[in-house]
From Swiss-Prot:
Catalytic-site annotation from UniProt: 185 (proton acceptor), 189 (lowers pka of active site tyr)
S-S bonds: none
Matching InterPro entries: NAD(P)-bd_dom_sf, SDR_fam
Keywords: NADP, Oxidoreductase
Pfam families noted in UniProt: adh_short (PF00106)
Other remarks on this protein: The various drimane-type sesquiterpene esters produced by the A.calidoustus drt cluster include asperiene C, asperiene A, (6-Strobilactone-B) ester of (E,E)-6-carbonyl-7-hydroxy-2,4-octadienoic acid, ustusolate A, ustusolate C, ustusolide E, ustusoic acid A, (2'E,4'E)-6-(1'-carboxyhexa-2',4',-diene)-9-hydroxy-drim-7-ene-11,12-olide, RES-1149-2, as well as the 3 newly identified compounds calidoustene A, calidoustene B and calidoustene C.
Role: Short-chain dehydrogenase/reductase; part of the gene cluster that mediates the biosynthesis of various drimane-type sesquiterpene esters, compounds that exhibit diverse biological activities and are widely present in eukaryotes. The pathway begins with the synthesis of the backbone drimenol by the terpene cyclase drtB using farnesyl pyrophosphate (FPP) as substrate.
Superkingdom, taxonomy of origin: Eukaryota
Pathway: Secondary metabolite biosynthesis; terpenoid biosynthesis
Organism annotation: Aspergillus calidoustus
Protein name: Short-chain dehydrogenase/reductase drtF
GO molecular function, one term: oxidoreductase activity
Binding site for NADP(+): 26, 50, 73, 100, 185, 189
């Protein structure tokens, strides 16, 4: 049996959650912990086979686990929109969204939508997913009587956001074709933090009444983990082997702690909404650009405009 969580987590019976990238690594353990506590959890993933295998593993330990596969391909924005619509056909409530899926330091590649792979997978697809789920998130908050912390959105980011370009988000060259793999990764992770902060500003507990305040948000760094994410990187395999040998990586389950804490624990308070968390459920200031609210607003506007051009927000 796994050790107890390092924070309080009550029964989540009657609550519904969606976790992207839920079939592996941090996402898998996030789904597992929520399901163990009685929640209904949707596992967002691209591969039906891998998702069903992951669900089978969860149910082997927790036979009553209420976990369901929701197909989505984050490298295809239309697939993400379709996934959001599919979810809303199945459920009328969503208490928590964990934008978890991601890739790290991968070789330069463009999606079919024309965006650099890390930018789209880590940031852009999660923005559009959240956008299309805002209506059900708001309805859930209303159904819960506006109860504090009853609806939350968590963006999984990284301390790798410090590798971003000096400007944070390079709107003049959003795909960063000539930059290094970690600069592109860093930009996407800055995007995650700014998304959580702007979402909190618009829909969070400090927002206006007209913005339907009350959705709590957070950006969380899971830590340096021994997951499949490291296998995707462009640097040599011996680097991962060395880091693993010297104990530089934590177990994937530990990486899920911040996500579960932020999306469901009563120990996460209203003052925590919109903040950046590092391992140990500790708040920390992110980089200067990642806490620039003017940049957060500009990025939100840029993203909305780009997606409207592609008729993805209608």
């Amino acid at each position: 049996m796994a050790p107890a969580l390092p924070f309080a987590l009550p029964s989540l019976a009657g609550k519904v959650y969606l976790v992207t990238g839920g079939n592996t690594g941090v996402g898998f353990h996030t789904v597992d912990e929520l399901a163990k506590h009685g929640a209904r959890v949707y596992m967002g993933a691209r591969s039906p086979g891998k998702a069903e295998a992951a669900i089978k593993t969860i149910r082997a330990e927790t036979p009553t686990a209420d976990v369901h596969f929701l197909q989505m391909d984050l490298m295809d924005l239309h697939s993400v929109v379709a996934a959001a619509k599919s979810f809303k056909e199945k459920e009328t409530k969503l208490h928590g969204l964990v934008n978890n899926a991601g890739i790290m330091a991968t070789p330069y590649a463009l999606s079919g939508d024309g965006f650099e792979a890390q930018w789209q997978t880590n940031y852009l697809s999660h923005w559009v997913l959240t956008w299309h789920l805002l209506d059900v998130l708001v309805r859930t908050l209303q159904a819960e009587g506006g109860a504090a912390g009853s609806v939350r959105v968590v963006d999984v980011t990284s301390d790798g956001h410090n590798f971003a370009p000096k400007v944070g988000i390079d709107f003049k060259d959003i795909n960063l074709e000539k930059a290094g793999v970690f600069a592109r990764y860093g930009q996407s992770k800055v995007g995650n933090i700014l998304h959580a902060k702007q979402l909190n500003k618009l829909y969070g507990p400090s927002g206006s009444e007209t913005a339907k305040k009350g959705i709590w948000t957070a950006a969380v760094h899971p830590g340096h983990l021994d997951t499949n994410l490291n296998k995707q990187t462009a640097f040599p395999k011996f680097v991962n082997t060395l880091l693993r040998a010297v104990g530089a990586y934590s177990p994937p389950r530990d990486g899920a702690f911040n996500s579960v804490f932020a999306v469901a624990s009563p120990e996460f308070k209203v003052a925590d909404s919109g903040e950046y968390f590092v391992p140990g459920q500790k708040k920390k200031q992110p980089s200067k650009v990642a806490r620039d609210m003017e940049l957060a607003g500009r990025l939100w506007k840029w993203t909305e405009e780009e997606l409207r051009k592609r008729e993805l927000l209608d």
